[in-house]
A protein has these predicted regions:
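Acidic, surface-exposed loops and disordered segments
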Residues: 1-164
């Protein structure tokens, strides 16, 4: 698939089958996230993939069998931008592999509890990191939705014409 075809084929999916994605596909998706642009080239983010359906039962994950948590350094100004670049790369790679995906926010709130902090410690997430969001992955339960037509007037090009 061409890149623009992948971009247009990507949809936020919120209904999944129980079928787990392969470890090989998960590693490709994580690699795509790892190669996302990051402010200043500092690579201050960290991905933790939960590849176990029993651990992803939180209802905010729409029964997806795999959840990737995107952690970033608290004190970094561009942590949100870095996280979303990583998440978008993962979504595009998943789409190319035929895997459904969706970005879920509320990462900071999810890990704000004592239980959440204990999970982070157990997973080896360093002190001073917070979860900026999640990418849920799996196989769509149902039909792939069609893209909505894009609203006109959302793109402007300034200064591209010939000067007279």
């Amino acid at each position: 698939m061409e890149l623009m075809d992948i971009i247009k084929a990507r949809h936020s999916i919120r209904k999944y089958t129980e079928k787990q994605i392969s470890r090989d596909d998960l590693e490709k998706i994580l690699e795509a996230g790892n190669f996302a642009p990051n402010a200043g080239g500092g690579q201050r983010s960290m991905l933790v993939a939960v590849h176990n359906k029993e651990l992803t039962t939180y209802n905010g994950f729409y029964d997806a069998p795999t959840v990737v948590c995107v952690f970033c350094q608290d004190n970094f100004l561009f942590k949100t931008a870095d996280a979303f670049c990583m998440m978008e790369n993962m979504l595009l790679q998943a789409t190319e592999l035929g895997i459904a995906s969706c970005i879920i926010s509320r990462g900071q709130e999810t890990f704000a509890s004592e239980e959440g902090r204990q999970l982070m410690k157990q997973w080896g997430v360093p002190e001073g990191y917070t979860c900026q969001g999640f990418v849920i992955l799996g196989y769509i339960d149902g039909e792939t939705p069609h893209s909505k037509p894009r609203k006109p007037g959302r793109i402007k090009i300034i200064g591209c014409g010939e000067l007279g």
